[in-house]
Amino acid sequence: ALEANFVGYDDVLAMCRNAEKFGSDGDLSNRHAERLANEYLKILRDESKPYAEKYGIILMPSIQSDTHNIKMGECFGASADGRLSGQPFSQNSRPQFGSCSKGLTGMLGSLLHLPFRGFASGSLNLDVQPAMFAGEKGEKLFENILKTYFDNGGLHVQVSCQDVNELIDAQIHPENHRDLTVRVTG
């Protein structure tokens, strides 16, 4: 199915896309992500040890792709999570697009299973709609969600909070949105 990019394997593609994913705060997917991240750290430590001893190089591992997730996705075939050949990988520490079936708190709950103490960087690019956290109550809720995330070991969050209609209008009338900042990375 993967080699065929799921062509002719609609049933397998549906099973892959409906399986529990990292980002939904499910036990199985969280355990797999934690295991893989720990294995990644172990491999990096083991492989970099000779260079550290010989040259004094200190490896600073990260869960980071910046915008390379798009180019990397273009170079790889389909994957067992239901991502088709050529589609982007997830960006930085963010779970794969479409996998956060339990919303923001489910995504953050999954991320807290990663061993962030072993990583120098692992930015989460978080896109939220302004209406989700409107008003004083909404702002306080968002503050509490982020505070809880960081208090429990979360590493780094870059928040983008723009209304889709505002972005569309900015494309049509850029002169009316000179102070609008759209951050892609960094």
Regions found by a protein language model. Give the residues of each.
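Acidic, glycine-enriched catalytic cores built around paired aspartates
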Residues: 1-186
